[in-house]
Regions:
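Short, solvent-exposed positions on alpha-helices
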Residues: 11-14, 108, 185-189
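Extended amphipathic alpha-helical segments enriched in small hydrophobics
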Residues: 1-4, 20, 24, 163-198
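Well-ordered alpha-helical scaffold segments within catalytic/enzyme domains
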Residues: 1-10, 88, 92-105, 172-184
């Protein structure tokens, strides 16, 4: 909408703003669980993957879409977040804040989600955390994991790749957003933990 305004295309700008308002209202109502934003998906619904299967379907790895994204053994869609707390769940709002584009999500929900990222994704010492992927943080080092599944939430059997990892780009974005939202001590603690990993 901002770009359309800059180009003088008022009709397109109005259309884009209307689409945005509908999407914003839907996301705030349907994707916020009272504490953070989630991926709304039925992990057990094979038809969600089947919708992308086509005749002669082959992926780069040589398998078919259904083979790649459905586990017969567990009867579940692979590589999802579901009810987890994702480190980048409000990244769009961080970008909008930095660029002065305004509110993407409800401000109170954004602050709650940012606090949830600190509460659930920040691990002061990674030594007790199982990580089957790349090790960017270990033993007594701390950081924000890409996704966390707090007690009482369903963790997919085969979650989104790299969920248990820390990645400093994501971490710095989340930490700086915490600070921007007034969660200064939390954001600074995350930044200090990241910096200690590289000292």
């Amino acid at each position: 909408a901002e770009m359309a305004d800059a180009l003088g295309d008022r009709a397109a700008a109005d259309d884009y703003r209307a689409i945005f308002q509908r999407g914003k209202a839907w996301a705030d109502e349907h994707l916020f669980n009272g504490e953070w934003y989630v991926q709304r998906i039925d992990l057990d619904d094979r038809s969600l993957v089947e919708a992308f299967v086509q005749a002669g379907d082959r992926l780069v790895q040589g398998g078919a879409t259904l083979d790649a994204y459905w586990t017969e053994e567990h009867q579940e869609i692979k590589y999802q977040i579901g009810a987890g707390s994702s480190i980048d769940q409000i990244l769009a709002q961080w970008h909008a804040d930095i660029y002065g584009l305004g509110e993407i999500f409800d401000p109170e929900q954004v602050r709650s989600a940012s606090a949830a990222i600190y509460r659930h994704n920040f691990i002061p010492e990674m030594g007790a955390v199982y990580n089957p992927c790349r090790i960017y943080c270990l033993n007594d080092e701390g950081g924000l994991v890409i996704c966390a599944w707090p007690a009482g939430t369903r963790k997919p059997v085969i979650p989104a790749p790299y969920s248990q990892e820390t990645m400093n780009g994501f971490e710095y974005a989340a930490a700086s957003h915490m600070i921007l939202l007034g969660l200064v001590a939390e954001g600074e603690e995350c930044v200090a933990a990241i910096r200690r990993r590289y000292d």
